[in-house]
Amino acid sequence: MRERISNAKRVVVKIGSSSLTNDEDGHTVDPNRINTIVNALQARMEAGSDLIVVSSGAVAAGMAPLGLSTRPTELAVKQAAAAVGQVHLMHQWGRSFARYGRPIGQVLLTAADAGKRDRARNAQRTIDKLRILGAVPIVNENDTVATTGVNFGDNDRLAAIVAHLVSADALVLLSDVDGLFDKNPTDPTAKFISEVRDGNDLKGVIAGDGGKVGTGGMASKVSAARLASRSGVPVLLTSAANIGPALEDAQVGTVFHPKDNRLSAWKFWALYAADTAGKIRLDDGAVEAVTSGGKSLLAVGITEIIGDFQQGEIVEILGPAGQIIGRGEVSYDSDTLQSMVGMQTQDLPDGMQRPVVHADYLSNYASRA
């Protein structure tokens, strides 16, 4: 798997705030650190890979200019810091890549962008065109307009979504930790975990919170790595200090093995990025049919319609106890579905005998465990 990552053609590289700022105050962008990172990125690109960078650090970079000594928690202050810091951050990225004659392109995304299929496609096209034109895409969450509860939460998840969005061959998550340990790596009894093949390898792992200037701790990195690996993308998790060997031969850090069958772009989007408009509760038989049998969802297996939604919107599919089993694109609006609950297909009027959610537009979590 490490060879697969080292030979990957299209790679998304995520760099955390702590890897871009200096050690003294933790909220000043360090040009030397960025230069070191860019040197390694350039070497990988010269070897033939396409790279997309997901860069944290906007809020941290805006703290010093605004006289903030601690990371802001108030949304408006955080957004102000991001607005100031993003300018500083992109300036440093631009200066560093200019040493190699490479332009950069800023791509700011929100969860709302990823949640709408047309916006997600536009972002994908922009990133692809930047690469074709020889520019390095630098992606970050648009903190100045993102709102609490409608955001990615951290750039680790954003990186996983971008990796699938651009059909990446590998995702490299860089922070200030050498890889995954079963407990805090400062504990002398902590054991390093080299490979994660499935959830069993994570049993007993204790993942802590984020650092002083970032939002994504080890828990978020593990979550993002599993998200990407479930969608078919191998992941390497290591420290920014190891970026050279990480991009050269991937013989450092922790590798998360991908699922064998890569999710289609639509199914990944529906499961992990799309906005949902309502919910549909199923009986046990319908749950079995759509999760294990790969069947379309029929009206006969539905017990409850929750919320108001339109035909073509994405809804959550629930089991009898309310557990979320998947998501799908509905063929009918909620008012129409209310009249169809529990009915056999042959008893429905003409024009209402299509599946409620066709198997091609139904993605379940059980198959990605």
Swiss-Prot record:
Task: Give UniProt keywords alphabetically.
Answer: Amino-acid biosynthesis, ATP-binding, Cytoplasm, Kinase, Nucleotide-binding, Proline biosynthesis, Transferase
Q: Where does ATP bind?
A: 14, 175-176, 215-221
Q: What is its EC number?
A: 2.7.2.11
Q: Which SUPFAM superfamilies match?
A: Carbamate kinase-like (SSF53633), PUA domain-like (SSF88697)
The record's PROSITE patterns line, in alphabetical order, gives: GLUTAMATE_5_KINASE, PUA
Any one GO CC term of the record: cytosol
What EC class is this? transferase
Localization recorded for this chain is: Cytoplasm
The UniProt record lists the PUA domain at 277-351
**Positions of substrate binding:** 56, 143, 155
User: What does it catalyze?
Assistant: L-glutamate + ATP = L-glutamyl 5-phosphate + ADP
One MF term in GO for this entry? glutamate 5-kinase activity
* Gene Ontology annotations of biological process type: L-proline biosynthetic process
Pathway given for this chain reads: Amino-acid biosynthesis; L-proline biosynthesis; L-glutamate 5-semialdehyde from L-glutamate: step 1/2
Keyword Cytoplasm belongs to the record: yes
- Specify the domain of life of the species encoding this protein: Bacteria
What is the stated purpose of this protein?
Catalyzes the transfer of a phosphate group to glutamate to form L-glutamate 5-phosphate.
Indicate the family of this protein. Answer: Belongs to the glutamate 5-kinase family.
* Name of the protein this chain belongs to: Glutamate 5-kinase
Source organism (scientific name): Corynebacterium glutamicum (strain ATCC 13032 / DSM 20300 / JCM 1318 / BCRC 11384 / CCUG 27702 / LMG 3730 / NBRC 12168 / NCIMB 10025 / NRRL B-2784 / 534)
| Lineage, opening ranks | Bacteria, Bacillati, Actinomycetota, Actinomycetes, Mycobacteriales
